[in-house]
């Protein structure tokens, strides 16, 4: 069993856009909302390969239930320590030509 610790987890959103126009209005389709953060990403990779893992993470109170549901769906054992504040989020824009902007 490998235990991972994530002190700064994130809610990672990936949005597909045809092309990115700086200073303009960009519309896209939400492709995915995934749990992230270094330790969470390691636990996700380990679980995908069938290894036993246990994720320990500190989440803002509002994100803790969401993380719990997502990690349960991925069959990742976990302990979530609730903290004040909100959980960090990241947005990735993926253009049709393969360019990625974070």
What are these regions (language model features)?
Residues 48-102:
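Conserved N-terminal subdomain of the carbohydrate kinase-like
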């Amino acid at each position: 069993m490998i235990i991972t610790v994530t002190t700064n987890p994130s809610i990672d959103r990936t949005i597909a856009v045809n092309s990115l126009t700086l200073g303009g209005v960009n519309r896209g389709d939400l492709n995915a909302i995934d749990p992230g953060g270094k330790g969470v990403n390691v636990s996700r990779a380990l679980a995908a390969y069938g290894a036993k893992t246990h994720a320990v993470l500190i989440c803002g109170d509002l994100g803790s239930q969401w993380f719990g549901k997502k990690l349960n769906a991925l069959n990742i054992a976990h302990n979530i320590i609730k903290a004040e504040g909100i959980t960090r989020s990241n947005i990735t824009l993926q253009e049709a030509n393969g360019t990625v902007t974070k």
